[in-house]
A protein has these predicted regions:
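Short, conserved SAM-binding/catalytic segment
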Residues: 183-196
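Core catalytic lobe of class I
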Residues: 1-180
């Protein structure tokens, strides 16, 4: 499984150099790494990507252009305590979870909801941090023996959830401060084997 969060602060798409990339051509950048994800995924492997409403149409198009099969969009409802009110319009209290597979899906007896109402505890460790409870649910889709790859690890939430579940994991984070946060989080996380990780 590849888990990623292409969006950075204020709807900017993340860049491996400085965390921000102009919104003008986010599809080109996403297509490049999504094509590599497709190549790396085994048949039946899943891509799970969190995205803001501003880039949702682009991501669903580019996922398919990269050769993955779009399976749907789930919703993270950040709940009333984390919403941004919009004068004369709807509150922004949701993020979207685009999921896709490389080819036919593997058989899996896990049935997740389409909406996850979950408040992120404060203080946040990363600007686009996701709740650990949601990460734990997402990794339930992974059969034993698979590798969870988080291309933009941030504070390491999904890596910690994968580790707790006894799954193999690999993460990437170029920001030194967030790398340190991820490493500390993973050092404090154990799985059923009790083996402590070294670092990401």
């Amino acid at each position: 499984m590849v888990r990623e969060d292409a969006e950075g602060p204020a709807g900017h798409v993340r860049n491996l150099d400085d965390g921000r990339r102009a919104r003008r051509h986010p599809g080109d950048w996403c297509h490049a790494w999504l094509s590599e994800c497709r190549r790396a995924l085994k048949p039946g492997g899943l891509l799970v990507s969190f995205i803001d409403w501003r880039q949702l149409p682009t991501l669903t198009d580019v996922v398919q252009a990269a050769g993955l099969i779009l399976r749907g969009v789930a919703v993270w409802d950040k709940t009333l305590g984390r919403m941004r009110l919009r004068r004369g319009g709807f509150a922004q209290q949701a993020e979207f979870v685009v999921w896709a597979s490389r080819g036919a899906m593997r058989g899996c007896d896990v049935y997740l909801p389409g909406v996850f109402p979950c408040r992120l505890p404060l203080p946040k460790q990363h600007v686009t941090e996701k709740p650990l409870d949601i990460a734990r649910e997402v990794v339930r889709l992974m059969p034993a023996g698979v590798v969870v790859c988080d291309l933009f690890a941030g504070s390491g939430t999904f890596l910690a959830a994968a580790r707790e579940a006894g799954l193999h994991w690999v993460g990437s984070e170029t920001n030194q401060a967030y790398h340190a946060i991820s490493s500390a989080r993973l050092d404090a996380t154990t799985d059923d084997s009790g083996v402590q990780p070294r670092s990401i």
